[in-house]
C-alpha cells in the first residue's frame, strides 16, 4: 500500500497554500495571507512591511520580486517560512485541524511555474529534464503538522488526567 500524497494545494487542500485567505500576525503586523507575511519579511526596513498588510497574495508576490532583499535572506528564508507557517496554523484553529486531518499524507507543493525550491514543478520541461523539486514548503507543512499532532496528543492526555 502506497503512502497518500497531496500534490496540489488547491480545492479542498487550498488551506495548505500560502495564498489561502486567512489572517497571519507576525512581528506585530497582521497580513491577509501567509504569502503576504512571507513577502513582507524580505524587506530590509521593518516599517516597509506594513505595506503588505492589505494586499492580495498575488500583489504581495509581485512586490516581493521587485524589492531589495534584506541581508542574509538566502540563509534565513527557510526559517522565516517555518515561522510564517507556524503563525498561520497556530492563529487559525480550523486550519490547524484541517492540517492535522491530512494524517500522514505526504504534502507536495505541486506547481507548473518552475518552483523547485518551495515545491515540485510538474511542467513538461521539468519532467523531461528529470528535475526533482526540494519541496521545502511541503516539508515545513509536514513538520508543523507533526508539532500540532504532538500538542493535541499532549492536551488529550492532560484532559484525561
Describe each model-derived feature in a short phrase.
Residues 1-161:
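Charged, low-complexity intrinsically disordered segments
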